[in-house]
């Protein structure tokens, strides 16, 4: 290589395109120029530019000198775009140095000429995708591939041009504004963005404008805020507006790019419209028999507003003479309709037509729009009442009548009146509902409605009568109405007064004069209007009583006192004092009652000790409750007794059935040779089912045996005691609990042994059956009367031994003795 003159350094050439040259001729921004100059001026601290102290301050060592490269985006030429040139000051131009680059886009986007160091852009660049590329440059010896200069980093910046139009990124836009809003009311804000470099030129400076809808809305050029342009937006006229907003870059200058968006603006409702009835008069009809609560009809006022601004209420103003309470109106919350309802009975005859004024008004009124007028409207509603065939009407519908209880049958009680309310005014017929007058105490004239007595009356039995009177049309009995009548029976003095109770009093023998014995009161079933007043005196037949006196206390009671000192009950122990009671009438009635006074023996303190032979019983009475309680107790006792008897009978029948079922298991052992007093005793079933402790049977055990006779066993001689030679069978029964199952083997063994003994006994007659028995308890002194062991003739028998058996066998002995005498007489 040729020696390089000192003071030379790395140079980098930049090929400027016409557009870039134009930009450089313009005054560049101070920051960019400073950056370029700083990059183009070697610095002691920059890579590849260091200062050598041996050569002095003005001597610089060989190295890289390079500028920042620029390339314009969106190049449309057919040839590669020249970017710039890198060069080492050691390059002599002989091709010994090879230039290479590495980094972003090296070899693809950017290519370098190895000999000259020229860099070209091979692709179309877009600054909006990538604003700069960072690469590294190397200078190598072509022969040895040795680095001649340290590797240096440089940047290729993509120069922006206005190639991106503004874009609205947040659409679609929907805004709203209330109707009748003032001019300049903010609706919403729209914003666009531009991908161009905002720091270079005016490519990203945007301005906003209205392309469509400028008559109603405006937009701020800088902020994009949309506002109303007029104060009279009316939702009822137009509810939705489509406004086109445009954004232009280059600050709106000629040649700038633009983008647009459509903004939907909805006009919201306010309550600026009053309700309006579609017509000024409505007509309805309803039958006069319609019950209260029946809907007459529906009316709806229209409101151009929406939502809650259409909520309304209705009121009725009645202009008819019937007043304002015949109908009422309610509002259907779902349909906002007025429902006219009947709230009083209708009557075609009294008023066939009703005219009311229906008023509708908004429920919510906005005071901002009060100057627009009253938010209410009115309409006339006419309701025609149609006639129906109605039943007669009682006037009055109920009443009270009075009659004396001594009124004769057929006496007039009162008159009821009913009339047909219809225009035809048909005749009315009357009757009494017999369900309310089962005893037919009253009758009524079918034509006049006059009520008379049908039977005799008694106030004391029934003081009031409630009857139902029927009225019906003469030619249509289905049209029927009812009226309730209360008939009060007026009292007359027809019952004499009576003593309140059968009075009995007791007085001591040593009573003093003037001693109070009894206070008398009276009852009277009558109820005079002025109240009761009773008078007491002794009967005229005995006006003066030497023993007792009667004092009228003037309060409907009287007192009985003693007249003298002491009584002798031995002479007279009971006094009967007749008392006359008279009422005040009219007419005055009286009755006589008797006060029974008993003379009794008393102690020193006046306590009664005895009242002769007749017991003194104080008058007492039981209340209905006490009587009922007493009857209930008696019934309970009767039921308990019947229940006990039923249970006992059921228990007996149960035992009887059990005995019948077990009859086949009974073994009855008896002795019929005596007087018979022990024959009815049988063993208990539980004992028979238990195991007998028979022990070892001996040859002489088992008693006598006989075949087919009434009793078995050997008979003794005529004069010997009965069965003296027979050993008795006595077996003890086990005392433990009975065996759950009967052991029949014991009985088989016992019977088998008895049969074997009978077979071996030559004295036993040849019968197929035999009986065996044993004794239990005390022996009977009576011997056997069986003829099994007797002689061949009755004459050979001697019954003299019967007389030795005791007094119980004397009739039997006399019987056999007489029989013997007859036999002897026949024999002689």
From Swiss-Prot:
It is a single-pass type I membrane protein. Residues 64-168, 169-277, 278-394, 395-498, 499-616 form the Cadherin domain. Keywords: Calcium, Cell adhesion, Cell membrane, Glycoprotein, Membrane, Metal-binding, Repeat, Signal, Transmembrane, Transmembrane helix. Residues 646-828 are cytoplasmic. GO terms for cellular component: adherens junction; catenin complex. InterPro entries: Cadherin, Cadherin-like_dom, Cadherin-like_sf, Cadherin_CS, Cadherin_Y-type_LIR, Catenin-bd_sf. The chain crosses the membrane at residues 625-645. Cadherins are calcium-dependent cell adhesion proteins. They preferentially interact with themselves in a homophilic manner in connecting cells; cadherins may thus contribute to the sorting of heterogeneous cell types. PB-cadherins may have a role in the morphological organization of pituitary gland and brain tissues. Three calcium ions are usually bound at the interface of each cadherin domain and rigidify the connections, imparting a strong curvature to the full-length ectodomain. PANTHER family: CADHERIN-22 (PTHR24027:SF311), CADHERIN-23 (PTHR24027). This is Cadherin-22.
């Amino acid at each position: 290589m040729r020696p390089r003159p000192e003071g030379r350094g790395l140079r980098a050439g930049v090929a400027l395109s016409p557009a870039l040259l134009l930009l450089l001729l313009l005054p560049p921004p101070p920051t960019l120029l400073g950056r370029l100059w700083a990059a183009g001026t070697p610095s002691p601290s920059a890579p590849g530019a260091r200062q050598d102290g041996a050569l002095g301050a003005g001597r610089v060592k060989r190295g890289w000198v390079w500028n920042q490269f620029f390339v314009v985006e969106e190049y449309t030429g057919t040839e590669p775009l020249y970017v710039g040139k890198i060069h080492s000051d050691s390059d002599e131009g002989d091709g010994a140095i090879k230039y290479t680059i590495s980094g972003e886009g090296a070899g693809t986007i950017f290519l370098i000429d190895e000999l000259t160091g020229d860099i070209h852009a091979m692709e179309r660049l877009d600054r909006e995708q990538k604003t700069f590329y960072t690469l590294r440059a190397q200078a190598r010896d072509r022969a040895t591939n040795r680095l001649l200069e340290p590797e240096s980093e440089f940047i290729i910046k993509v120069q922006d041009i206005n190639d991106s139009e503004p874009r609205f990124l947040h659409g679609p836009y929907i805004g709203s504004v209330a109707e009748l809003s003032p001019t300049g009311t903010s609706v919403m804000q729209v914003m666009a963005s531009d991908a161009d470099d905002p720091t270079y030129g005016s490519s990203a400076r945007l301005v906003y404008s209205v392309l469509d809808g400028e008559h109603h809305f405006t937009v701020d050029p800088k902020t994009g805020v949309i506002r109303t342009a007029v104060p009279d937006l009316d939702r009822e006229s137009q509810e939705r507006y489509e406004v086109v907003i445009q954004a232009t870059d280059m600050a709106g200058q000629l040649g700038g790019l633009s983008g647009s968006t459509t903004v939907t603006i909805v006009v919201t409702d306010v309550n600026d419209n009053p309700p309006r009835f579609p017509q000024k008069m409505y007509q309805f009809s309803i039958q006069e028999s319609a019950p209260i609560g029946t809907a007459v009809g529906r009316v709806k006022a229209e409101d151009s507003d929406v939502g809650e601004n259409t909520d309304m209420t209705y009121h009725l103003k009645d202009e008819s003479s019937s007043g304002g309470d015949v109908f009422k109106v309610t509002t259907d919350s779902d349909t906002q309709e007025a429902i006219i309802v009947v709230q009083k009975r209708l009557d075609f005859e009294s008023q066939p037509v009703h005219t009311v004024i229906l008023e509708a008004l908004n429920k919510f009124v906005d005071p901002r729009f009060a100057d627009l007028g009253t938010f209410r409207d009115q309409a006339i509603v006419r309701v025609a009442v149609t006639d129906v065939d109605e039943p007669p009407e009682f006037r009055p519908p109920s009443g009270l009548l009075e009659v004396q209880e001594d009124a004769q049958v057929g006496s007039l009680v009162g008159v009821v009146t009913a009339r047909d309310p219809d225009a035809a005014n048909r005749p009315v017929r009357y009757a009494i509902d017999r369900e309310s007058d089962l005893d037919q105490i009253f009758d009524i004239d079918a034509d006049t409605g006059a009520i008379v007595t049908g039977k005799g009356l008694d106030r004391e039995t029934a003081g009031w009568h409630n009857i139902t009177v029927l009225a019906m049309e003469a030619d249509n009995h289905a049209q029927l109405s009812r009226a309730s009548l209360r008939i009060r029976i007026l009292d007359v003095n027809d019952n004499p007064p009576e003593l309140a109770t059968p009075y009995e009093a007791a007085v001591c023998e040593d009573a003093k004069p003037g001693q109070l014995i009894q206070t008398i009161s009276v009852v009277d079933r009558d109820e005079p209007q002025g109240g009761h007043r009773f008078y007491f005196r002794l009967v005229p037949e005995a006006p003066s009583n030497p023993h007792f006196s009667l004092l009228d206390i003037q309060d409907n009671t009287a007192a009985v006192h003693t007249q003298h000192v002491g009584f002798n009950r031995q002479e007279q122990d009971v006094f009967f004092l007749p008392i006359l009671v008279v009422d005040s009438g009219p007419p005055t009635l009286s009755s006589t009652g008797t006060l029974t006074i008993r003379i009794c023996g008393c102690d020193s303190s006046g306590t009664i000790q005895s009242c002769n032979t007749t017991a003194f019983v104080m008058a007492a009475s039981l209340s209905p409750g006490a009587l009922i309680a007493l009857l209930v107790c008696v019934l309970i006792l009767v039921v308990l007794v019947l229940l006990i008897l039923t249970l006992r009978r059921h228990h007996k029948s149960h035992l009887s059935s059990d005995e019948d079922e077990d009859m086949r298991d009974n073994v009855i052992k008896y002795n019929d040779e005596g007087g018979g007093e022990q024959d009815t005793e049988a063993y208990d079933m539980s004992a028979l089912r238990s195991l007998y402790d028979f022990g070892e049977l001996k040859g002489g055990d088992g008693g006598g045996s006989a075949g087919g006779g009434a009793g078995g066993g050997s008979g003794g001689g005529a004069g010997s005691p009965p069965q003296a030679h027979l050993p008795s069978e006595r077996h003890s029964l086990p005392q433990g609990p009975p065996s759950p199952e009967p052991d029949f083997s014991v009985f088989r063994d016992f019977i088998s042994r008895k049969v074997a003994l009978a077979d071996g006994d030559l004295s036993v007659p040849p019968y197929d059956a035999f009986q065996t028995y044993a004794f239990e308890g005390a022996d009977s002194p009576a011997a056997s009367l069986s003829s099994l062991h007797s002689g061949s003739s009755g004459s050979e028998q001697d019954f003299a031994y019967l007389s030795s058996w005791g007094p119980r066998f004397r009739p039997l002995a006399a019987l056999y003795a007489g029989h013997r005498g007859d036999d002897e007489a026949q024999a002689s």
